[in-house]
Amino acid sequence: MSTDSVSIINIFLEIKGKARISCQLKRHLSPRTIGLITRSMPIHDNVHRMNKSVVYIKTNIDSGMERKKTDFKKGDIAYFPTGGCICFFLNDVLDGQPMTPIGKLL
């Protein structure tokens, strides 16, 4: 994890033996949630598929909804408070579950 600015935190999503993906957490999108996530790192879990457009990892992070959105673009990262999950969007999603936007896959 590296901080290149006050607002952007660069991290890597590592899939054991498969890939290492650069991500950016953007503090200005959801400062409270980003703070909880960064203090909880590293986060380890299996990747789960929610549907054809979303994969997620479960966390022990307990944060409520912050600046919720229901529309996400391919490459977005969001926190799903109902399940305590960090979600990664593989395709655009319109009118989905309300989630807290937290960053982007690079």
Language model feature labels by segment:
Residues 1-44:
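Start-of-domain signal
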Residues 27-36, 40-106:
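Glycine-rich active-site loops that engage anionic ligands at enzyme catalytic sites
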